[in-house]
């Protein structure tokens, strides 16, 4: 399984859930992420999990070459796309960046998946904030 947004609240819970069920989990982490990875620190400090069943890969959603190379190499059966702008106030301060990351990043990821020989199942998780609620 591949998870984007693995360092977020939902991504960290999903990681724990998948690992508890015996899955190998690969997480995509933004290179420029300023967000704390504290939600998965307990997993990355566990030598029986980290780099055994949990692997982190650093790439931004606008880095099509790296993501394509990673997906071809890993050939995941499932992709859980949870990455997105999670700070509502910030999304209003930087609307173009938010759109680029959230909408265009998702589009790029879907285009790569569509071109794979064995496209994985794809779950895209959004937020009610998308609708201004």
List the predicted regions and their residue ranges.
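N-terminal Rossmann-like NAD(P)+-binding domain of SDR-like oxidoreductases, especially those catalyzing
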Residues: 1-133
């Amino acid at each position: 399984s591949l998870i984007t947004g693995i360092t977020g609240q939902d991504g960290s819970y999903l990681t724990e859930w998948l690992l508890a069920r015996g899955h190998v989990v690969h997480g995509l982490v933004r290179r420029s992420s300023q967000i704390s990875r504290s939600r998965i620190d307990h997993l990355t400090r566990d030598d029986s999990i980290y780099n055994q069943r949990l692997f982190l890969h650093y790439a931004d959603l606008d880095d099509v070459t790296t993501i394509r190379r990673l997906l071809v190499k890993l050939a995941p059966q499932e992709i859980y796309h949870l990455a997105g702008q999670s700070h509502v106030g910030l999304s209003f301060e930087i609307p173009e960046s938010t759109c680029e990351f959230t909408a265009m990043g998702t589009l790029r990821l879907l285009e790569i998946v569509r071109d794979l020989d064995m496209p994985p199942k794809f779950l895209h998780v959004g937020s009610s904030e998308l609708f201004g609620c």
